[in-house]
Amino acid sequence: MRYLPHTDTDRKAMLDAIGVASIDDLFTDVPEAARLDGLIDLPTKQTELQVERALAAMSSRNVAASHAPFFVGAGAYKHHVPATVDHLIQRSEFLTAYTPYQPEISQGTLQTLFEFQTQVALLTGMDVANASMYDGSTACAEAVMMAARVTRRTKAVMAGSVHPHYVEASQTLAKYSDVSISVTDAAPADLDAVIAEIDDTTACVVIQTPDIFGRLHDLREVSRIAHEKGALVIAVFTEAVSLGLVEAPGHMGADIAVGEGQSIGVGLNFGGPYVGLFACKDDRRFIRQMPGRLAGETIDADGRRGYVLTLSTREQHIRRDKATSNICTNAGLCSLAWTIHMTLLGEKGLTQLARLNHETACELADALSAVPGVELVNETFFNEFTILLPKNADQVVNDLARFGVLGGVPASRLYPGRFENYLIIAATETNTPEDIAVFAKALAGVL
């Protein structure tokens, strides 16, 4: 098919149709300083070697997570990914695979999706899982919308300690629906404020554990109260490794479990792509309203076991107004990486990994708490916790960087204008005793 560019007349007609005077008006939300007035002055006729050197020089200005003591978390975690994972997902059968519309030629892809779903369901203590979402935030947002459809109610209550990005994603989706989201204060460690918001109009309650500050929550009581009012409970997690040690959401009464799977099989990747996990209880109402795709196991006409897309109520398959989401193909490769890594770990390996993460975090918390002026905020945590500093956390992080330490996420970056002296810190199996010692010494130096 030939490429036929739009004429000036075509462009004017399109701009007139949407009521915009010029193409520049389409980009008014982009700051002037970030816009290009013309072409970048790039060197021409460079060899491949010269281009590689130039790009390497540019990338060297970044501080790689592997090149410094790294304690940044808040939704994205540095874990070791076995070489086997990257090797297998680069096989052409997986790397170039498309949505398995034709099961007879897509059994490998469909089986891995089925295995992924099985692992997610087991991990979360749920009965059914879909074939993944874009990331944890979109999984959370879709869960809120699903709960509204199932209960036919329009009020969602979210704990303020749910990751702010997850809250914003949910609010964005709710903005174009009848759903209203009530967000409680993030400061209290208990769930009393959430419970107080639950009434007969509540569709769902959304709670994260471990939450954005690293605090662990027992969902049993809030689940009981929510269910008495006819509301669903959505449990959120940003650190999937925690489920190797912490009680699964399904075992604490949650109806839907959603979260980020990046910490298993997927690198930091400059913030994406990641893999959203989505699971729920075995209820026909839930399954029919679950977003995305579900791979199922069946028997063909010859009695052979096979795999197919059992449910796929996304907008590419059915009418847009009847679709439950618009999840697409590219999420599949990350879910494959997750499945391979989880298979390599096994149940015992995941528990060992989770325990190592927790022990490392405990050692770090002890070391930092010993620094004069530093107070540990958390009573409970998995591999992430928050400390209270005697000075602005944002400034402390910048000072730590000059010591070569990437020392966490200032809470004020997630809650502008609040928690200015609070620093959220994560520790994983990749952190060594030497890293912890360097961090503690550097922190003492900048305070």
Curated annotation (Swiss-Prot):
Q: Which GO terms describe its biological process?
A: glycine decarboxylation via glycine cleavage system; nucleoside metabolic process
GO terms (molecular function) for this protein are:
glycine dehydrogenase (decarboxylating) activity
Q: What's one Pfam family here?
A: GDC-P
Record SUPFAM superfamilies: PLP-dependent transferases
* Oxidoreductase listed as a keyword: yes
Matches recorded under InterPro entries:
GcvPA, GDC-P_N, GDC_P, PyrdxlP-dep_Trfase, PyrdxlP-dep_Trfase_major, PyrdxlP-dep_Trfase_small
Keywords assigned by UniProt, alphabetized: Oxidoreductase
Superkingdom classification of source: Bacteria
The Enzyme Commission number assigned here is: 1.4.4.2
Reaction equations catalysed: N(6)-[(R)-lipoyl]-L-lysyl-[glycine-cleavage complex H protein] + glycine + H(+) = N(6)-[(R)-S(8)-aminomethyldihydrolipoyl]-L-lysyl-[glycine-cleavage complex H protein] + CO2
Top-level EC class: oxidoreductase
- Give the NCBIfam families listed for this entry: PRK00451.1
Q: What does this protein do?
A: The glycine cleavage system catalyzes the degradation of glycine. The P protein binds the alpha-amino group of glycine through its pyridoxal phosphate cofactor; CO(2) is released and the remaining methylamine moiety is then transferred to the lipoamide cofactor of the H protein.
Q: Subunit structure, per the record?
A: The glycine cleavage system is composed of four proteins: P, T, L and H. In this organism, the P 'protein' is a heterodimer of two subunits.
| Homology family | Belongs to the GcvP family. N-terminal subunit subfamily.
Protein's name according to its UniProt entry? Probable glycine dehydrogenase (decarboxylating) subunit 1
- The species this protein belongs to is Maricaulis maris (strain MCS10)
* Gene name of the encoded protein: gcvPA
